[in-house]
Curated annotation (Swiss-Prot):
Family: Belongs to the YbaB/EbfC family.
Annotated protein name in UniProt: Nucleoid-associated protein swp_1717
Subunit structure: Homodimer.
Known function: Binds to DNA and alters its conformation. May be involved in regulation of gene expression, nucleoid organization and DNA protection.
Organism: Shewanella piezotolerans (strain WP3 / JCM 13877)
Keywords, in A-Z order: Cytoplasm, DNA-binding
Length: 109
């Protein structure tokens, strides 16, 4: 079925992919992205593991109503989370060579 040495090569390739995935996951955890809301008046910096590192609020918003500020902070957090997901997807595509996984299947296995 696999031919001479085919299974060994397959296992070696699987191990190499697993090693690459571990490195990419470390890179993702260290990366930081910034999400914005209100045309940049509120910025949230988030790590690849979805930890919020920094919230930057333009001083002009501190004079406005509290509810609007809360909405902008939530929107900036959501934007940062979306950017993290996009970066994770791009990084994993580099490792998998764009291989499409079945829905619900997560890497690493």
């Amino acid at each position: 079925m696999f031919g001479k040495g085919g299974m060994g090569n397959l296992m070696k390739q699987a191990q190499q992919m697993q090693d690459k995935m571990a490195k990419v996951q470390e890179e993702i955890a260290r990366m930081e992205v910034t999400g914005e809301a209100g045309a940049g008046l509120v910025k949230v910096t988030m790590t690849g593991s979805h930890s919020v590192r920094k919230v930057d609020i333009d001083a002009s918003l501190l004079e406005d109503d509290k509810e609007m500020l809360e909405d902008l902070i939530a929107a900036a957090c959501n934007d940062a989370a979306r950017r993290v997901e996009e970066n994770q997807k791009d990084k994993m595509a580099e490792v998998t060579g764009g291989m499409q996984l079945p829905p619900g299947m997560k890497m690493p296995f």
